[in-house]
Curated annotation (Swiss-Prot):
GO terms for molecular function: glycosyltransferase activity. It comes from Mycobacterium tuberculosis (strain ATCC 25618 / H37Rv). SUPFAM superfamilies: Nucleotide-diphospho-sugar transferases (SSF53448). Was identified as a high-confidence drug target. Keywords: Cell membrane, Glycosyltransferase, Membrane, Transferase, Transmembrane, Transmembrane helix. The lineage of its organism: Bacteria, Bacillati, Actinomycetota, Actinomycetes, Mycobacteriales. May play only a redundant role in maintaining cell wall viability and bacterial virulence. It is found in: Cell membrane. The chain crosses the membrane at residues 227-247, 262-282. Pfam families: Glycos_transf_2. InterPro entries: Glyco_trans_2-like (IPR001173), Glycosyltransferase_2 (IPR050256), Nucleotide-diphossugar_trans (IPR029044). This is Putative glycosyltransferases.
Amino acid sequence: MRLSIVTTMYMSEPYVLEFYRRARAAADKITPDVEIIFVDDGSPDAALQQAVSLLDSDPCVRVIQLSRNFGHHKAMMTGLAHATGDLVFLIDSDLEEDPALLEPFYEKLISTGADVVFGCHARRPGGWLRNFGPKIHYRASALLCDPPLHENTLTVRLMTADYVRSLVQHQERELSIAGLWQITGFYQVPMSVNKAWKGTTTYTFRRKVATLVDNVTSFSNKPLVFIFYLGAAIFIISSSAAGYLIIDRIFFRALQAGWASVIVSIWMLGGVTIFCIGLVGIYVSKVFIETKQRPYTIIRRIYGSDLTTREPSSLKTAFPAAHLSNGKRVTSEPEGLATGNR
């Protein structure tokens, strides 16, 4: 059985070497056939140099250097596209998610027969103010996205090769990987994880809002349907009000001047109109970007052996006798991998 560990690097210089040490130790408990893939997402620090230095002592390390910063999600998809393992362990390199999670994730995947075991916050770190934004994000996603996103999911996950191959078939240029994880399907099992928190994050409030907008507009047409019904409701209400005013003016009394109400109505309808046009513009811009068919990342260089022509064997072949016995993992000898084009 071959195991791939995939991680991305951005401002990761303080963590690369320790991440490698922990990841390698966790992988060696499962199989000797390992590859560790670092994807440099245009990191401005020395993370790339540290990762490349590992090649001198471990030929299982591969480093994919992107030509610039493309974003966390696109970097992850690039790493997954180059993974050749029968199982693929995706995890962030900042050590907030411990690489030692690989072993319990592996045991749960084997015991449940799942295609994916993904981490979820057992309890979100930080106070209520820090967690208020994520709660609103997931509530909005549950209301507007189809399918709804699983709440409090983490990057860390263990996946079969069949699932990864299906996942990387998605070719959206504007990636929202949380939605892709969901719509790819397969049998997915959550697992509670106590995630550490180093006190800072590269996901600013602006990035979180942008992520929410991407999630909603990439996987749902509900906002457009909402606009349709909103417009219909405004038309019905305004038509009814106009009819009432005309009848009132003709049969009952003179129409009183109401400049304040007129101005408020104009501003309100103007704001709704601008909002709706902007929302439609987001959808149109996504169509525009997709029609260009640009690659979602560009690789500048790959350090280490390129094994992308090596195809993983099926999970059934990789685990002919793997099972849990009395809570302990029992595995057979790893089998050879099939070869062919991937």
